[in-house]
Structure formats: C-alpha cells, structure tokens
Amino acid sequence: MRRKVDLARRLVAVALCLAIASAGCGHSVLNPVLHDPDEPPSPGKRSPMLKVHLKSGELLVLDSWRLSDDRSRLEGTGTSFSVRREEGARGRQSVPIDAVALLETDSPEQVRPFGTSALAVMTTVFGALSAVCAADPKGCFGSCPTFYFPGEDEGRPVAEGFSASIARALEARDVDALFAGRPDGERRLVLTMRNEALETQAVRRLRLWAAPRPPGGRVLADPAGRLHAALELVPPAGCRAPEGDCLSAARAFDEKERVSGADASDLATRETVELVFPAASGRVGLVVGARQTILSTFLFYQTMAFLGRGAGTFLATVERGEVDPARAMGMARVLGGIDAEAAEGDQPFRPIGTFDEAGPIAGDVQVLPFDASGAGALRVRLRLAKGHWRLGYLALARLGGRVDARALSPVSVEKNGRRDDEALSAFRAGDRHVVTLPGDVHRVAFALPGPARDLELFLESEGYYYEWMRGEWLSEEDPGMALLALTDPHEALRRLAGPFHEREPGLERAFWSSRFRK
C-alpha cells in the first residue's frame, strides 16, 4: 500500500513539474480561453488559431478548422506537436472529437517547447473585469451556476449546480432540494440561472424532479438521492456547540445559521455539535440543512495561485487521466462533511450517515435515515471541521415509505432576454453543453403536473466549469506548495491555517459583494 501511495505522489509530482516547466519564466498573459470540444469556436480575427489538447498529451495548433458533417471529427490545417512539444507534421489534420481533452484559443507565439514559454489553458483576467473582487481576489464570488426564483435575484440563490465539477473530467450530476420554494398554486415554475462568477460554465442538462408531498409533510432526499416521505418534522429540544447554545439557528429553515471560526493552527481540526430530540421509534431520519463556508473556495483559489502559470497545463493532465481527478480536491476531502451519530437513552453512539454537499452559496437539505427504538431521549452528535460548515436547519423526521418522483424537462428557455431554442434542446436532451460566460442569464420555465404547494421539487443540473485565473494570483506561484496541496493535503491544511485565519473575517462579505452582473 505504501508503494502505491509513493508512486501516486511521484506521478502527481511529475505532472506538476511538467506543468510549471511548461509555463517558463518569461510569462506573457494573452487571455487564453477554453472551449467545449463539441463546440469549437469559429475561426476569425478574435480566434486566429486553435490549440487542440489531445488526451494522449499531444497538441495540434490549427489555423483553420471545422467539425465534420457528422460532428465526430475536428478537421483543419496546422501543425502537430509531441507530448514534449517537439514540432511534427504540418498540413492537414483530423482527429476524433472523443480524443480531445481541451480546446483553447489565444495566439500562436504561446506555443513553445517545455521550459521556454507558456502553454496555458486558462483564461486569465486583469484590470476592470476582475475589479469586482479586487478587494480580496481570494474572496471572489464563484462556484458554478446559481439559480433564483424570479424577482429574488438580490437574495441568496435557491440552488447552485455541480459545485465540485471544476473540470470536464469531474463533470457530475447534482440534485438539490428547492426546500424553500414558495407554496403557491401555480402549475408553472420559472428559475433564473446566472453565471455570476469569473468562470466558463458548461451546462449539459437541467430538469426538475417533482414528488407528491404527504399531507402536512415533506419529501426529503438522502445522500444517495433516494426520496423519503417525511410525515412529521420535529425540531430539536436542545443544541449545544463549543460556543454555547445553538438552538435558535437550528430550529427553523431561515436566514439564521450556526458557524464557527476555523482553527488557527490546523484547518482540519474537528468540533462537535450536540442535539437532543424527544424519544422516537421506527424509521426516522436526521434532517440537515447546511452549506459550506468560504473556506473550501479559498483553498481552491489558493491551489490555483500556487499552480500559477502551470494551472492550465496541470488541468490538461487531469483531463487526460494522467492524475487522479480526486487529487485535485485533496484538501476538500480532508475537511470532509458533517458526520452524524445517534444514541438513545444510555446506549452508545452509532454512526447514521454523513452530509457532504459542496458549495458555499445555497447548500442543500438532506435526510440521514436510521431506525430508532424509543428507548429514551434521542441524542445526536455532529462532527465537522471547524469553520467549514454553516448549519441552518436541523430536525428529526418521522419517515414513511420511499417516494417516486417525476422528471420534468424545461418547456422554454430565454438567454439574456431572448428566446433560445438551442439551449432548450440541449437542456432537454443532455447530449451537448450550453456554455455560459460571466454575466449570462437564462430563464428556464417548467410546467408542473399539479399545484406547486402539493409537490416537493428538486433541481437536477449536470455539467462542469473552469475557473478563470486571476492576474493577482500569479505573484503567488509556488510549485512546492502546489505539490504539497496535491500530495499531502493534511500538511497543506496546517500550513494554510494561519493565512486563512488572518483573512477569514472579511472573506464572506467580499464573496457576496463580488457577484458578477452585466
């Protein structure tokens, strides 16, 4: 086992060294932009050449290109480069789309052998565009598409999509409860999807799942996505955290949240929150409504800063499968979720599940089902990393049976105020991506099978995004710390505890004040 761990670390180190080496010392930022392989940009003055990063590690630089009629191949004229960027054949080129890791547009002078110049695959922003988060670039708003009810765009979003999908190799399906949905009688639901971050977002699918609510109850999803009828929701009788009573934050699904500061010496340090519920028997579940703090976003941004000019090239190695994608999320994995244990009367505690929903924006509400015997008051213990979670709602659900939901595809889509049938078709089919840029707004409408007040609604989104490198981060490039973050996240969390602790008080405010709007 030790050999496997050492080998994995060496592979990451090699990939990282190549990434940093490819950036070189004389870096010149020319705003490279990523594109979905299925949707290459049209040639023109703004895109005079196209870099085609292949999954094999090779590269094509094309000065003209097109998709084949059946959209299965990318064809054009240009030059091929080996894995070490040695120049190969010139002339006509043709590659299968499924062999492409990334597409990139910028300028041809960026292509050089390893060790002499940049071969970035990230958009880098300076000046006015990044001024929205100039106060603290590590506090910039970001983390996937955000969703709002109409007229509520200035408040907190009701959902955020695929927060952990920071690359195409990490594309994932995300389902979030619209738990705070308005209980009206309308049979139509409109959601506003925004790209409010300095990101390129690629959305493959959007749809709703509608489940009939039991009389006077709710429908809750467990971490595996199974739906359960919640016949009754019982608030806790007591809530104790290290700072004292936390009952007011836990009893209702509202704006009140319980949160602590991160540990100043080790960001992985755990804390305990204790709950007490009346005795219960039968099938029950702990209901957890929570979202992450800005800590996880800060660590992601800091890792990108450490990678610096090599961030894009390292990302390409992830896309090609040379590095386990999970290693890019190493510090987040160490921070972990909210581990829950339960005990009845004088019985010992037993684990009942883990809540672990990525993202600091909207969070989610889930249930952790377990069986209770009624032997005495029900005690629940939550273990979580200090400063990593905001607890907004805690309850005990009396569960009924499993519930089936009906999938609802969009019936109309508008982009930036204009009808967009192409996006509608993509969201419904899920066979291609709709690419959004900062400031883009989509209004997505769904027809409901009954009055909204009688339905539990869940939003499914599928896709990925690429964060844009901030020009201010390039001065923090540190290959040693980048390697540490990717190969020894425990030690990285100890070293980053001090820097985060110093900036923690203002990060949340900077995050929410830097939403990007056109």
Show which residues each predicted segment covers.
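Hydrophobic helical h-region of N-terminal Sec-dependent signal peptides
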Residues: 12-20
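Bacterial N-terminal signal peptides that target proteins for export
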Residues: 2-12
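Short beta-strand-plus-loop segments that form exposed binding edges in beta-rich domains
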Residues: 381-389
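Hydrophobic alpha-helical membrane-anchor/signal-helix detector
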Residues: 100, 110-135
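Bacterial Sec signal peptide processing site at the extreme N-terminus
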Residues: 19-40
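Post-signal peptide N-terminal segment of mature Sec-exported envelope proteins
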Residues: 33-61
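Extended, hydrophilic extramembrane loops/domains of integral membrane proteins
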Residues: 73-106
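Activation corresponds to long, low-complexity, non-globular regions
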Residues: 128-375, 389-518
